[in-house]
Amino acid sequence: MITSSRHPYYYTISFALLIAAGMWGLFWIPQRALEAGGLTGGWATISQMVIPFAMLLPISLWRLYKGQSFGLEYPLIGLLFGGGIACYANSFLLTDVVRALILFYITPVWTTIFEIVFLRQIPRFYRYITLALALSGVWIVFGQEGVIPLPQNSGDWIALLGGILIAASAVRMEIKKPEGIYPILFSFFFYGGLFTLIQSYFLSDYLGDAPSIESWVAMMPWLLLIAIL
């Protein structure tokens, strides 16, 4: 068995994760605003992958010219990470916000399972507290009238899948230990963009038709702002 040691910047990283989790918890606000502005058919999610990819592409080409990492050498990490976020983003368009958040944020359950199976790590005691809180939230939201708390629509299942993919990507990164953040970032947008295109095609009956040119023009400033942020 491999026992994990605490990182020297454990509390700093934990605080950063807390802020990041809170910001991702508010992601449904711009996502639904973009849909209300006309970006139907899951194209709000697609554009949030494709536009940053296009902005980073010149940097990747420059890195390739300099003999550095181009950024596409982690396809599995990019596919899992980008696919997880794509599922999370599109789930807000197909189910209630609270249901999407609860199902996505039980990610620690899947992370713990993957760590035990693939990394042979023994969870610390506070992980069990996290798991208990996560599963309690699922039971409160989905376990009404004593029924088994299972997802009830396509948006629920997509949110659940998103959490599983994010957990798998975290474990994969722990195994591969990539050097630097840029290759992960570029792989995320490239492979995540491919995932969103395929997902939107298969979910077209649920997500709606492609947006009009007028909607693209009206929403483009907001899409560029989101991409920069």
Task: Annotate each predicted stretch with a short phrase.
Residues 56, 126-144:
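Hydrophobic transmembrane alpha-helices of multi-pass small-molecule transport proteins
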Residues 12-20, 64-87, 153-162, 209-229:
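Loop-to-transmembrane-helix transition segments
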Residues 60-63, 90, 107-132:
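C-terminal transmembrane-helix exit sites in multi-pass transporters
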Residues 29-41, 142-154, 201-223:
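Membrane-interface helix termini and inter-helical loops of multi-pass transporters
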